[in-house]
Regions:
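Non-cytosolic beta-sandwich-type ligand-binding/adhesion modules
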Residues: 25-67
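Beta-sandwich interaction modules
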Residues: 1-14, 49-101
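Aromatic/hydrophobic beta-strand junction motif of beta-rich domains
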Residues: 19-24, 81-83
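Generic detector of ordered secondary-structure context
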Residues: 24-25, 73
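Short beta-strand/loop motifs in extracellular/secreted proteins, especially
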Residues: 17-19, 27-32, 89, 93-95
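Intrinsic disorder/low-complexity segments
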Residues: 7, 20, 38, 45, ...
Length: 101
């Protein structure tokens, strides 16, 4: 599957991490909020990152348009977002990801 990974975002180590994510046009895939406790995590090194929360859209759960939130209290120094596209001919898209901590 094709996937996109955001750049890393410096976070407040022990605070709530909130993200608002908007998808549209029947997006099929997985959106994941990831964190890292490393001082200098590498974008390409998956072992530097752990999953905080995931939202999955498949044929049964896809929607024309939706905004949802991740809201988790996690101890980490960095945050990033990843989305994986599950269909080769997909028309759906992730419109925006807004992050606050």
């Amino acid at each position: 599957y094709d996937y996109y990974v955001s750049s890393r975002i410096k976070s407040d180590e022990s605070d709530y991490h909130t993200a608002s994510v908007t998808v549209k046009n029947n997006f099929l895939g997985t959106i994941t909020m990831e964190g890292s406790a490393d001082v200098n995590p590498q974008e390409a090194n998956e072992s530097d990152w752990f999953v905080i929360d995931t939202k999955d859209y498949d044929d049964e759960t896809k929607v024309d348009e939706e905004t949802f939130q991740f809201n988790k209290q996690v101890n980490c120094m960095w945050i990033r977002f990843k989305y994986t596209i599950k269909a080769a001919n997909q028309q759906g898209e992730v419109v925006e990801i807004l992050y606050r901590n």
